[in-house]
């Protein structure tokens, strides 16, 4: 029998060992530590306890599975075996569901309780023939009263949810969900209260108007009997009103009369109704029930009596034409049914205000002229707008039709489609235009997701941590030698050759504490890290050679440290060499506002020798002293946060990232998010390549398991939810891709006219593959700085890892050069490159790559043309030959003259003509050149105006290669 311990079983069940121990104790299994073993009996006992606690029950069904095999013959004579599987579930009859069946009927009397109380009131109902009241009247009434009721109903349904998911969600998450539901319920209740208050205010205002001007409804009795007859003939409805009780508002029976039904004699005090059964006006009394919903008769809002009384026309003759039907629907328009609401169109009354009424549409317009309109104020939504959103998604968030959003955008001058993507700024303007509240959503901010667990992390006690030190300085000032000596002196003997295991950061144990040294790829990477606001470096050690002094890169390092507001410790190296002048270095550093403590400043100066090992302990002591002043602290028992120092692509292990933990503890199995890369930590190693399970603050580690190679200097953090990490990473990748494409498009548009004006720019396309991410970044930046107005370097692709066949194919398509920095091409890539003639160059030093690319760009520059004077010729005799022209007999007085040279004719020190030679002869022979002191005969091309004494200057145009 295989035994497992509590810790292993907890990891299988996705529980913490402490939680599993609590459940085991509650089940009666005595286990004290996560290392205790668990038997099958213990697991069975725990399972029985969990079933009892969660209310498990026996299966009430039997599953029958039937399988049959048959063969089907095809046309070609072959057979195909067909297997048919049938599955049937037989449910065992159970008494429990029958007993529980009547329970859902209990809430039913609740909504009917209100009408039940009003049953004694409508007893005099048979005396009154309320024929104008259509039967659909009870339908709108429950709609108004039932609107708020379904909203509280989900609350009891949500009660059992914590019991069913208690084993999955923590109590804090359940409490957060319940708080969110309460907040939503309060928000809905507040909106309903505001709407009711608005309706009541409108009704009170309308009631005041009705009370001020209340005409006598005299024409009503004349019209109503005929309407009664027509309605009865049309509907065939019984004369009695069998609609049942109206509610608990203590209204008395209605008097006879279909149109003007008069005041209710009950205690309703609502004043007289206006004429017209189909379109009943508002209740002028104190009945604050809100507007009637459009029912079967499409009665809509009740108009004011002042408008209703004059609008009654004389009764039409039985056989005569009805008003409003003289033309073929001539009175109808698009606005006919707008004022009566958008209810269901059914057969209405004859009062002239229904869509099928016989009174014509003209009266309908008069009736509704001063009618009370139902409040149409929309519910204000709080819309979270991401960085990009489509028109359809934006309309869905505002609970409106997409057509309305498109109309709003058209008013703003934008012609869009329903699937067009809007940017965040435009979407926020649209939301505000449509009367809603727009807020910019921070969907890609992990801090917003971690706000839920802030209550846990705030209480974590911060503990002192070791300092993170960056060593900076000029190239040849002994920075690397100093780091090597510190590792050799303070690390175990077996790690003496640990420089080859370079991961960019390592920590050193000293008698007074631990120090983490950070070796950034260069100053630019250091600035980029500081610009992101990540406090990766606590102290900067500035290395200055005593025999060389302050150099440009030293000054640059000082500026970086001051911009980041990081304290400095100056290490004056090479003090054992002759010619070392420490005092001169102090004076030069003071000129750059780095004042030593001896001179009243705040910067420690330590004189060291990396070669001899002098004062190395004093340097470490100064670093730890500065760290004590800073009081560096960080939480330990929380999710880890850190920064990516370096990243590379390992052929066997995939993406490998060097992570410097800044706060919290990173454990094996945590989900890490770094920019657009995410993944679960499959393995962790320290700087010596040893596998570790956890790393605390200020500890550098190599992690494996990320989905892609992250950017150097990117912030990294551990998340509790892998799904959320994937969502954020994919969102960032899509956003970065959109931004990159937008930038490229903008650059094309901006540079289009400039390139057309300046002519075509020569472009050198390059593909860079490097060993680590920092290397190709530095190389790409250095090469792009070589671009000028005439030649340009285009980095088509850059990445980490070896040169693959896909890289060579890209180079073939784009006619690019492939540069491998500390990498090599595989066999397939080499063979393809040889066959296609792709140039692959390998470099180990960045300066060699920059120099060769610079030389290639220089060759692409247009050569510079210069004029080189060859010699001077004096014309001593002019011979005229018919059909040939003038021939000059000359003497070469200086230099030489060539047959291919250009000629400049000078007369009286003035240039008369510039051209070419047509022929050059010495005696009767054609010659290519004539040197100084010899005579020759020559003839100019297309020019005969030559005289004795003229000077001829021979010159040629020479192209001189340019360089960057």
From Swiss-Prot:
Disulfide bonds: none annotated. SUPFAM superfamilies: Initiation factor IF2/eIF5b, domain 3, P-loop containing nucleoside triphosphate hydrolases, Putative DNA-binding domain, Translation proteins. One of its GO terms (cellular component) is cytosol. Pfam families: EF-G_D2, GTP_EFTU, IF-2, IF2_assoc, IF2_N. InterPro entries: DNA-bd_dom_put_sf, EF-G-like_DII, IF2_assoc_dom_bac, IF2_II, IF2_N, P-loop_NTPase, Small_GTP-bd, T_Tr_GTP-bd_dom. Residues 609-611 are annotated as: G5. Residues 573-576 are annotated as: G4. Residues 26-375 are annotated as: Disordered. The keyword Nucleotide-binding applies. Residues 49-60, 91-103, 118-154, 174-206, 225-236, 243-252, 328-339 have a biased composition (Basic and acidic residues). Residues 498-502 are annotated as: G2. One of the essential components for the initiation of protein synthesis. Protects formylmethionyl-tRNA from spontaneous hydrolysis and promotes its binding to the 30S ribosomal subunits. Also involved in the hydrolysis of GTP during the formation of the 70S ribosomal complex. NCBIfam families: IF-2, small_GTP. Belongs to the TRAFAC class translation factor GTPase superfamily. Classic translation factor GTPase family. IF-2 subfamily. This is Translation initiation factor IF-2.
